[in-house]
């Protein structure tokens, strides 16, 4: 089985929930501009609406907001919507960009009252900047240290009242003190296919694509519950329809296009199937350690564990057990193989 040698190939998978190279502008054009336009996440939308409306009636700033969940579900879009709903300016940065306390102090000093500060990947913020953020979130001030050693002095600086919106794909990686300073936390879940159909219909309208209802359902079914993936697959299918058909996307056109791009009926791509194939054919379904499995497909263990495994576990094709990874009966049947008699759930597997 061939190695996926180029890291960019792994990162630019059609079913990757992360933004790929050159995708930012197109992704931005499809973003909803208000809570009313935002599709899916009904509980989060309702809760956010109450938080924002309450703040507007009081004439103050809402509590700091933490948005958590897998990539590609709309956390950045919601941050933009929060600023728009409040009629406030949005300042954007990311956790990795805040390496020093001075980086954060410079950004905070430029805020004006009621601004929204969005920190993406907030779990990756450096500790000195995080500790400065505590005081800014609680008391709207920061202490800037001038000088070094015994002669260093701390100068307090006032910060205009602002709302921090943090986004994270790993809420468990946040420190307790930082997490506790968010007054409202929303967890975003994967989308149902019917919700993705609505996302696709909206995007098709914006992009001027003729998309049949059955075609939308076909694309939605393969989009791994993620709007960003759905929109990417829509653009790939559009290219196929324009080059090899009359530009109209029917169900058959969608199926043919996604076969070309190696996205099967459950949303698995070539790398996913390579992992399942190694697990079933080379290791008889497991259990097997992730490092051994990674060697079998010629990949890094972190790639298998962080890129492939989350979806395969959620799709019910791989189970994590104390003894290692195990292929479920669904994995065997998806590959057209007969599950062994001693499959998952049999006595002794989890001993």
From Swiss-Prot:
The EC number(s) this enzyme carries: 3.6.4.-
Residue numbers binding DNA: 320, 325
Region (Disordered): 1-23
Main localization category: cytoplasm
Region named Large ATPase domain (RuvB-L): 1-191
Keyword entries, A-Z: ATP-binding, Cytoplasm, DNA damage, DNA recombination, DNA repair, DNA-binding, Hydrolase, Nucleotide-binding
Compartments where found: Cytoplasm
Domain of life where this protein originates: Bacteria
UniProt record similarity statement: Belongs to the RuvB family.
Protein name as annotated: Holliday junction branch migration complex subunit RuvB
Organism ancestry: Bacteria, Bacillati, Actinomycetota, Actinomycetes, Mycobacteriales
